From Swiss-Prot:
Residue numbers annotated as active site: 117
EC number in record: 5.4.2.10
Organism, as annotated: Anaeromyxobacter sp. (strain Fw109-5)
Protein's GO biological process: carbohydrate metabolic process; peptidoglycan biosynthetic process; UDP-N-acetylglucosamine biosynthetic process
The entry's keywords: Isomerase, Magnesium, Metal-binding, Phosphoprotein
Cofactor field: Mg(2+)
Identification of the protein by name: Phosphoglucosamine mutase
Amino acid sequence: MRNGTSANGTTGHAPIARRLFGTDGVRGVANVHPMTAEMALQLGRALAYVVRNGSHRHRIVIGKDTRLSGYMLEQAIASGISSMGVDVMLSGPLPTPGIAFLTESMRADAGVVISASHNPYQDNGIKFFSRDGFKLPDAVELQIEQLVLGESGLEEFHALRPTATRIGKAKRIDDAIGRYVVFLKSIFPKDLTLDGLTIVVDCAHGAAYHVAPAVFEELGAKVIALNVKPDGKNINDGCGAVHPESMAKAIQKHRAHLGLALDGDADRVILADEQGRIVDGDAIMALVGRDLIRQKTLAKRTVVATVMSNLGLERALAGAGGRVVRTAVGDRYVVEEMRRSGYNFGGEQSGHLIFLDHVTTGDGVAAALNVLAVMQREGRPLSELARCFEPVPQALVNVAVKERRPLSDLPEVARVIGSVEKALGKDGRVLVRFSGTENKVRVLVEGTDGKRIRAQADEIADELRKALG
């Protein structure tokens, strides 16, 4: 049985088990444990405690998306940080990769993003970046978690109360949006423009509602901006990367050359070609990876993907002399493998794309700019470029569960998975894993017969519901 990170072909270390932190920070329903103001304050204190190193005046950047609860959590975590004698710099609504960029460029000691990414507005989350713009390693998150939960280092942590003259200050960052827009435009080749192109941009009423339209307009495109009026409750509501259908329809209505749908914090993107056909993260990795191979700029001719990526990605890259290295699910693990092994491009099927020569984390706008650069350089539409990727049929079922028992402790589930794997043989694969952000088990079956694999995925899901539901 291939279960989570133990799936064949994966590299790197298994994620460290933690109680608060998932694969993308701490996440939950706003104002319900652990996503409360009290917890945010303690997380801020613990982060400030961990990053204090040296005698300089320490600073931490805080950004957020457009959720109603962002105001509450922003003030709470800022209070926790400043109570430890560390200054706070507030960006307001800005994409997650924008906070990573500002953290590094402003020489801050850490960055904080308040967002639940593609989740509905009722949820929120808190994730941390180190001073170099990369997500904090699992081990550092564990250290923060232990401080918050009272498991280690308590005496010094609780005793550290700076005097009134040493309490941290908080201030707004001047033109955070403008700084990030300038950076994104610098990624696009200087000898190219977007003149003559019409682009549909779905911002999901999220953090990129100012940034994304500005970038493409300033590079010369005519922009059809969708879902750019956040009200605190409409983020990701029937729009954005999880619901790209309206973006695809707008392409046909406006006869656009390309469409892109971002999620709430704009760290992922789903594209659609000029005919309104969806182009997901795997297809983007295939076409961009092949282009980088042609340009001789793909490090070690390797793209880093996760165990969820389609087998069609491996075949598309193999046809151009490239290969795929797989990791556990989560863009943080893709980035860790890229840094560890010297790779420069990778991502996830869901649309997290990391161009490590330019950015430190998934960046939806940067990914779209890289695809547009290929289109302009080659003089070919996205529909033609995306033909290099032929997906193998996949069936994905998400099973809501009440408990997270090890799958190895569920003999009937193991028996059904083994039976399906035997039936698939070398023409497919099975992946069963717990979600890192939700109380769900994800069942993925890949094979040549779409109807058959759907039935097989449902069979496994039914057994999981009996055992854990």
